[in-house]
Amino acid sequence: MSGETKDYPEGIASKTQNFDLWRNTCNGIVEASFASTCLLVAIRYFEASDTVKSLLAGGGSIGFLITPLFLLLIGRSKLPVSIICSILMVCAAISILISASATTSWFYASCVLIACILAVQVPSLMVHIYSNNYNSNERGRKISGNLMLSAIVGSITALLIGFLLDEKLNYFRIIAIATFVLCLGTAYFHLKIPSTPLKA
């Protein structure tokens, strides 16, 4: 069953690395979309107020502030961590999709903020998966390789998104829909990674 650890340790590590590679590829594009689109659209398309711009800029930090409380709550759920990560990404995807229909800066910012706060909970949960699924002598190599791929894919995506938005700012709606699809892809690959529940 997806989300549960049932393989031998060697199989767990291999399966984790393979699906985490695909997860990081999708996630790199999603993160680049956040970084390249949100503030630019808020400023240039919606002519957002300073308050809205500040909230968007601090979305990730707001998410990190509530991470300890979030971990405490989900530790009681007894769900495998990969399933929780998948649920978070599906909810973030829906919020991003809704943002494509935004007609005001506050509505747009609210959707993006919710998506950002949900998405930034995932890295702390992935630490649990990496700790359980990789041996200590291979953990750094396997994690860093996938993160490097995410960074490379993300930088290329950010450049392409910048060109698109310079061409026509209204393309942010298409970008949001594409990001929605990639968030769902990230959620799917989370489900394929073996994991155990958090201990409260």
Task: Give short role names for the model-derived ranges.
Residues 2-67, 71:
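Helix-loop boundary and gating motifs at the non-cytosolic
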Residues 15-17, 98-112, 168:
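Helix-loop junctions at membrane interfaces in 12-TM secondary transporters
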Residues 25, 95, 105-123:
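Hydrophobic core of transmembrane alpha-helices in multi-pass small-molecule transporters
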Residues 39-45, 72-77, 100, 151-176:
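Transmembrane alpha-helix termini and helix-breaking/packing motifs in multi-pass membrane transporters
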Residues 61-68, 143-161:
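Glycine-rich segments within core transmembrane alpha-helices of 12-TM secondary carriers
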Residues 87-104, 163-166:
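C-terminal ends and interior cores of transmembrane alpha-helices
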Residues 120-134:
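Intracellular juxtamembrane helix-capping segments at the cytosolic ends
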Residues 180-199:
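C-terminal membrane-cytosol helix-exit motif in multi-pass small-molecule transporters
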